[in-house]
Design a protein with these regions (language model features):
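Electrostatic, structured charged patches in enzyme active sites and in nucleic-acid/phosphate-binding
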Residues: 1-204
Length: 204
């Protein structure tokens, strides 16, 4: 997936222009296939969740525009899922706008509006934000192999146990990068990541 570089339609160009004036943290992404561009804080938050969704292969910001009864619309994301499903997604405050959903259907696009309450529910967003601070901090090979070997032997470790494994990088930096790159797994829904959080090898 990539952005068009020439002759962008007017609504798409306007969306790029607006997003280029915004800066939201964390800056790092893992599965965004082009430049991360967000028009709202809420869209950035949804992007955080896309990076920790095990079913997501890749995602793209502001992918296209399509006609609706309200005028041209540019969705926040195009998301490729496992199994070949491709969906256009908007971050919305409450519910989808019927005219936009209808416009997507008429254009032959699979579309979904994700409400704020779904994004902010539980601890997943807060944990994703914390880990994405380290998205660009690649865990050194020695530490990766030590961690995977320790998990192979023990079956699982707590975060506190993992502190003894890492030697070349800070433990939570290494753990975060390995989680984001699907080398290890943790439950990030039920509580904030802490010393007792259990770490396992990512299921293959």
């Amino acid at each position: 997936m990539s952005h068009p570089h020439f002759e962008s339609p007017a609504a798409l160009y306007a969306a790029y222009e607006l997003a280029s004036t915004k800066l939201y943290y964390p800056r790092g992404t893992v599965r965004c296939s082009a430049d991360p561009m967000f028009r709202t804080r809420f869209a950035r938050d949804l992007g955080c969740l896309l990076d920790v969704d095990p079913d997501v292969v890749a995602w793209l910001c502001l992918p296209t525009e399509f006609e609706t009864a309200l005028g041209p619309h540019v969705p926040d994301f195009l998301v490729d899922y496992e199994g070949g499903v491709r969906m256009y997604i908007d971050a919305v405050d409450e519910t989808e706008i019927p005219e936009i959903a209808e416009g997507a259907a008429l254009a032959g696009l699979r579309y979904r509006a994700v409400p704020r309450r779904e994004v902010e529910e539980g601890f997943r967003l807060a944990n994703a934000r914390d880990m994405l601070r380290y998205a660009r901090c690649r865990t050194p090979l020695n530490d990766r192999l030590r961690m995977l070997s320790a998990l192979e032997e023990a079956g699982s470790l707590t975060i506190a146990d993992c502190f003894q494994v890492f030697r070349e990088t800070q433990p939570l930096t290494g753990i975060s990068w390995m989680y984001l790159h699907r080398l290890i797994s943790m439950d990030i829904d039920e509580a904030m990541i802490g010393p007792d959080t259990v770490v396992r090898r990512y299921p293959r």
